[in-house]
Amino acid sequence: MRTRARQLILAVLFLASFGATPSRADLPPLISREILFGNPERTFPRISTDGKQLAWLAPDSKNVLQVWVKPVEVKEGKIVTHDKKRGIRMFSWARASNTILYLQDSDGDENFHVYGVDLASGSVRDYTPFEGIRAAITATDYKFPDEILVSMNLRDRRRFDVYRLTLSTGALVLDTAAADDVVAFTADSRLQIRAARAVTPAGGTIIRLRDNAQSP
């Protein structure tokens, strides 16, 4: 008897659930894939160090994200990058305000290189033109407008050493070599590496400090 009663209750609840379900006609329209996954109209605005120019990301006529730049008093901007495939996702101003720096990989391989666009000439330079490496900008400082620190696994694919990059010439000099367990570096206001973050065998994190650039 109890079994039949339980079955009856379940049947009633099952039928009631159909009545509580709204029909497809009552549902709001589906959000389009373009809204969910498409490019934004404009995003990631960045003002130059001297405060005279504004840069942002926006799609070009082929819907590829590019960097756009304009003087702050001008209404319309112009495209300064010309990527043909995946578009630009990450960029920043150089401290001298005459160069846009951006990261780009090749066909989604995530081996990002550091590029620079000279705004006066429009020329693009790959500052890390080495096959199979991955690079990133580690630090910049307004007191050193022609220099940045770049991390790159050129010497050993497992280690990301820090290199000092001169933007005007493209010269790269090894600044700080990474130990096996180091995963990140931090620079001070003089653009000197002063701290390293390392991972312990147990999965923890330790911070190593040094007094100056000559210290290990």
Language-model-derived ranges and their functions:
Residues 1-9:
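Bacterial N-terminal signal peptides that target proteins for export
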Residues 9-19:
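Bacterial N-terminal signal peptides
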Residues 25-41, 70-89, 107, 118-135, ...:
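Multi-bladed beta-propeller domains
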Residues 34-65:
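Beta-strand-rich domains and repeat architectures in extracellular enzymes and scaffolds
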Residues 49-50, 95-96, 142-144, 189-190:
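Residue-level detector of Asp-centered blade-edge/turn motifs that repeat once per structural unit
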Residues 51-55, 98-101, 147-148, 194:
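Hydrophobic beta-strand positions that form the internal "hydrophobic ladder"
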Residues 60-65, 107-112, 153-160, 199-204:
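Short, solvent-exposed loop/turn segments at conserved positions within beta-propeller repeat blades
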